[in-house]
């Protein structure tokens, strides 16, 4: 078991004073079978009115609004989370069971294409080949490895609005793209797949008490009789280094910050993630 502290700070600077802004932050880690949230707080400068709710996908959302003129806005989420090294084992399912109407009806929302995970004949052909040679759980790993083989990890080559196919055409991308491309393959095979946002401590041999530059990260969940997590970017099942925050169909459902404001565009955006292993 690991205990980690994560501080995620996002700062905006506006061209001219924004007279009002309305925002949602998905920055609170989840409590589930492999991780426990000890504490979390989301704070803003300037101070705002806020409230929390759980969205459709089970992600904690902090909604806040600021109705006074402001030229800067900083949102900081501070969390302490305990994580386990291994997830509980899940039952296996056959291709025949995956193709049953009961499964298709139950998981329809995470089987359908989205703007980030569109249908593509080339990718579908890859999925068909993988499904022919692997049982479902191993097919998930094969799909992730295929996506990884097609993309070079190069930050800055894609943006938050890029789809998995955009990254495939460029042959490069970041963790968001690796996850989206993997989901395209999974859904083409009829395997329910979800996008996960969170954090990754970069050091497997992390020193207790040492603060390091962390990473916002993305990976996938697949359902093969039960949900389990796999990281296509690093080609591993997730470990205690991973902290999950949001789950959804794609990036749209888990964007860390989204909102609207009245005023001219932001001239600067600064994001800092710091992670400390506490135990």
Swiss-Prot record:
SUPFAM superfamilies attached to this UniProt entry: Cysteine proteinases (SSF54001)
Pfam families linked to this entry: Bact_transglu_N, Transglut_core
Alphabetized InterPro entries for the sequence: Bac_transglu_N, Papain-like_cys_pep_sf, Transglutaminase-like
Highest taxon of the lineage: Bacteria
Family: To M.tuberculosis Rv2569c.
Protein name as catalogued: Uncharacterized protein ML0607
Native species: Mycobacterium leprae (strain TN)
Record lineage: Bacteria, Bacillati, Actinomycetota, Actinomycetes, Mycobacteriales
């Amino acid at each position: 078991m690991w205990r980690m502290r994560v501080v995620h700070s996002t700062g905006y600077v506006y061209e001219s004073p924004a007279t009002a802004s309305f925002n949602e932050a998905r920055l609170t880690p989840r409590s589930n079978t492999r991780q426990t949230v000890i504490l979390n707080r989301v704070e803003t400068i300037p101070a705002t009115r806020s409230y929390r709710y759980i969205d459709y996908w089970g992600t904690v959302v902090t909604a806040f609004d600021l109705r006074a003129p402001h030229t800067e806005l900083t949102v900081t989420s501070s969390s302490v989370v305990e994580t386990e090294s291994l997830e509980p084992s899940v039952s296996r399912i056959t291709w025949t069971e995956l193709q049953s109407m009961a499964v298709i009806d139950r998981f329809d929302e995470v089987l359908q294409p989205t703007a980030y995970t569109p249908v593509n004949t080339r990718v579908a052909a890859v999925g068909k080949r993988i499904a022919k040679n692997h049982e479902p759980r191993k097919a998930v790993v094969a799909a992730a490895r295929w996506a990884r083989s097609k993309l070079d990890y190069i930050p800055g080559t894609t943006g938050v609005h890029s789809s998995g196919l955009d990254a495939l055409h460029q042959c490069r991308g970041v963790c968001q793209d690796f996850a989206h491309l993997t989901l395209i393959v999974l859904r083409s095979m009829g395997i329910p797949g979800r996008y996960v946002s969170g954090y990754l401590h970069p050091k497997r041999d992390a020193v207790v008490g040492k603060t390091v530059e962390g990473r916002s990260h993305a990976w996938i969940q697949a359902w093969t009789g039960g949900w389990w997590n796999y990281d296509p970017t690093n080609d591993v099942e997730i470990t205690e280094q991973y902290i999950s925050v949001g789950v959804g169909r794609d990036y749209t459902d888990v964007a860390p910050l989204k909102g609207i404001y009245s005023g001219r565009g932001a001239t600067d955006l600064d994001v800092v993630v710091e992670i400390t292993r506490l135990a």
